[in-house]
């Protein structure tokens, strides 16, 4: 969340996609879909028309990507199955969602624990900069618990016709032609606690892999490996007077003590705070970095009690392969987590929905078989819309997270109100209006100046350490 601030100073002008979905809603408004909305696709296809049945699609994984995909498929007339291993899963996720996600995915306000309107970016030398000064009165960053958000999206998919299966996906048999079914093997639990479950199979026409960084669907299509970060998070119940401080405030800490290539965070939840960090390059030291994050925030969380400890891998870039035949990857399984900020919830849900829309469109609301060309439309649209964001944040991480002096420069630039305005336009709405050319030029000069000072400081520090 924090490092998206730098999108603006490298000239990134991410525009909202101008492509219109190839469907129309049969009732109510497209801008705010109700829970049981149905839509139809206008298309023509040469692929086989299905006889006496609908297209069958399985979504593996019930997080934001899987829930959004299953709901969209079910609304579009697809026979939809969603397989999720752990219905109460709690991921070590900061839980920040942009304002646009609340409206775009019609999320009820009661699943949002906190509306963050104040943010602090804290440098290695503990210089704190307020980075939410340009937020308008109605604007905020939502803080959610993943177990609450995920369960809500799965339930909404079920309400719209998806069959939600409590099961552990094991493997799939891949057909040799373009029309035979994929045979999925899984252990079904039927709400049982413990045990290995009952071995079952399911035949489907297409598969969406939304099963996270350790995706078995990705392995089944030989999607390749990627670098990943380890995220470590502790949920800490703190005294009421301390919790009042974090009521609408989030903190991000940068420094090689909390992470050599990421940041530490303190994010407010319903009645506790989430304190965490992550790293790609020094995974074995993650507990040391977590301890340092707690130490940096110690006065503000004093008297707190750890109520839950969570750890999970987070992808650092998209997989080499995200599609094969009638199988596509979305969310963390595809590698859709941004560098610097670690943002993934919105992009997971968005990719799940976009992939499902491509299937609904290609199948004419479940009436025809789909093929790889249909699913590839999702990838083409995704890459066109979001690829620049990932590339820019990759560069920014390499520039500003490489040393403590560079991190000091980063925090210094976050104090600029123009940076903050462009940041939150981009983060909250996933679109940025054209900037002010004079302000852009001034910002570029200030950025260069900050980096020059950072490099000079690093050289002096290196001399002292010899």
Identify what each model region corresponds to.
Residues 1-38:
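N-terminal chloroplast transit peptides
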Residues 280-311, 320-321, 328, 353, ...:
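Flavin-binding catalytic cores
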Residues 26-30, 360-466:
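C-terminal helical "tail/cap" subdomain of flavin- and related membrane-associated enzymes
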Residues 312-335, 339, 387-392, 398-408, ...:
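FAD-binding beta-loop-beta segment adjacent to the flavin cofactor pocket
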Residues 51-52, 76, 155-306, 315-321, ...:
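Predominantly flavin-linked oxidoreductase catalytic cores and closely associated redox partners
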Residues 96-162, 166-167, 172-187:
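A conserved beta-strand/loop capping segment in the N-terminal third of enzymes
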Residues 58-62, 71-93:
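Glycine-rich FAD pyrophosphate-binding loop
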Residues 45-65, 81:
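Beta1/beta-strand and adjacent pyrophosphate-binding region of the FAD-binding site
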């Amino acid at each position: 969340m924090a490092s998206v601030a730098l999108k603006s100073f490298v000239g990134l002008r991410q525009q909202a996609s101008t492509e219109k979905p190839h469907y129309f809603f049969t009732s109510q408004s497209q801008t705010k879909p109700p829970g049981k909305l149905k839509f139809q696709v206008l298309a023509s296809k040469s692929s086989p028309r299905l006889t006496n049945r609908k297209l069958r699609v399985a979504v593996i994984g019930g997080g934001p990507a899987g829930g959004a995909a299953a709901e969209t498929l079910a609304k579009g007339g697809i026979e939809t199955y969603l397989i999720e291993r752990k219905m109460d899963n709690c991921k070590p996720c900061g839980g920040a969602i942009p304002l646009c996600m609340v409206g775009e995915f019609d999320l009820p306000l009661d699943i949002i624990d906190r509306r963050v309107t104040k943010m602090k970016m804290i440098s290695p030398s503990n210089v704190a900069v307020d980075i939410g000064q340009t937020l308008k009165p109605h604007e905020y960053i939502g803080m959610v618990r993943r177990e609450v958000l995920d369960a809500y999206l799965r339930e909404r998919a079920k309400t719209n016709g998806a069959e939600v299966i409590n099961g552990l996906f094991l493997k799939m048999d891949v057909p040799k032609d373009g029309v035979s079914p994929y045979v999925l093997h899984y252990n079904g639990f039927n709400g049982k606690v413990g045990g290995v479950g009952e071995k079952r199979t399911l035949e489907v026409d297409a598969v969406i892999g939304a099963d996270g960084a350790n995706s078995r669907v990705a392995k089944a299509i030989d999607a390749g490996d990627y670098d990943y970060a380890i995220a470590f998070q502790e949920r800490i119940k703190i005294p009421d007077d301390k919790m009042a401080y974090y009521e609408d405030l989030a903190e991000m800490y940068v420094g090689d003590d909390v992470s050599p290539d990421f940041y530490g965070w303190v994010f407010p939840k319903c009645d506790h705070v989430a304190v965490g960090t992550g790293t790609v390059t020094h995974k074995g030291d993650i507990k040391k970095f977590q301890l340092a994050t707690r130490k940096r925030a110690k006065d503000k969380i004093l008297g707190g009690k750890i109520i839950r400890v969570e750890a999970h891998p987070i992808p650092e870039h998209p997989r080499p392969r995200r599609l094969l035949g009638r199988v596509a990857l979305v969310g963390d399984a595809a590698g859709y987590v941004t560098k610097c900020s670690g943002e993934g919830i919105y992009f997971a849900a968005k990719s799940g929905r976009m992939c499902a829309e491509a299937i609904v469109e290609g199948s004419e609301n479940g009436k025809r078989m789909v093929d790889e060309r249909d699913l590839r439309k999702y990838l083409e649209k995704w890459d066109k819309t979001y690829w620049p964001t990932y590339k820019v944040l990759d560069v920014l991480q390499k520039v500003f997270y490489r040393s403590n002096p560079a991190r000091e420069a980063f925090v210094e630039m976050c104090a600029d109100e123009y940076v903050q305005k462009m940041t939150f336009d981009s983060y909250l709405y996933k679109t940025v209006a054209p900037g002010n050319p004079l302000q852009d030029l001034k910002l570029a000069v200030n950025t260069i100046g900050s980096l020059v000072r950072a490099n000079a400081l690093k050289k002096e520090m290196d001399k002292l350490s010899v």
